[in-house]
Amino acid sequence: MRDWIPKRGLTSWQSLDKLNTKGDSERMIDSTAAALEAVNDAWTRICHECRSVLGSELHYQAMIYHSLRCDGRVPVDQLGMNVKQWIPNVTSDLFKKLDQSKNESFRGGFEPIPDIVIFSPNVGGDWRRRRADHTMKHMLVAIEVKASERANRRLTYSEIAGDIAKLSAHQEEARVRGYNFTPIMLVIDTAPDPKERITQTTSNDLRALCIELGVEWRYLDPCDDEVQRIGSEHRLTSGNEQDK
């Protein structure tokens, strides 16, 4: 039991010794393959629950997190949201460009913030910003979420493509350091008005970009859900396949 779990959060009839922080149904996730299996197991619930309400992008992220905990059975100490990860001395072209675009006094690296991350067990339930390299080492899956939530506007190609490019650059930074993870772009496009959803042409172009950059594409509209795994066989045998 970690000594930083606050006792004040327990009721009078509970004790730290009896508190079960590992649910009985939680699974062992120590590889990229196991993390992707958890995402697949959660996918039906993600589709159902994200179609059941209309809300903000942040709300959909929370629903995806909930689905990964429930049906994906991802342990609580291996599932992070909005994970800040400062990367000094970036090597990818995109992150170099983004670093140089900042005020000179703030240069020296770039900080991607994946919406949802599944980690290997050795992350130890601690993915604070101060542990950036440790956090990167133990990433298995990183998910970026985009949702159609604007009135009289649809998501644009550039908005989603920007996140796809950042996922790819983040993976490149990890690989340079001897790590690896699978990047996933998940688009919740459930707006009831077709004029507020991306066009088929945009969808096709985004899928093509995912193929080019090696990012898994998942798309959900009000009727159909689409999963396109890009180069998954290569990714599943690369880098952080087993927890180290």
PLM feature spans:
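Short acidic, S/G/P-rich loop/turn micro-motifs used as interaction or catalytic elements
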Residues: 123-125, 148-153, 191-196
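Nucleic-acid nuclease catalytic cores
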Residues: 171-201
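Charged, often low-complexity linker/regulatory segments
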Residues: 4-71
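Mg2+/Mn2+-dependent nuclease catalytic core
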Residues: 137, 148-171
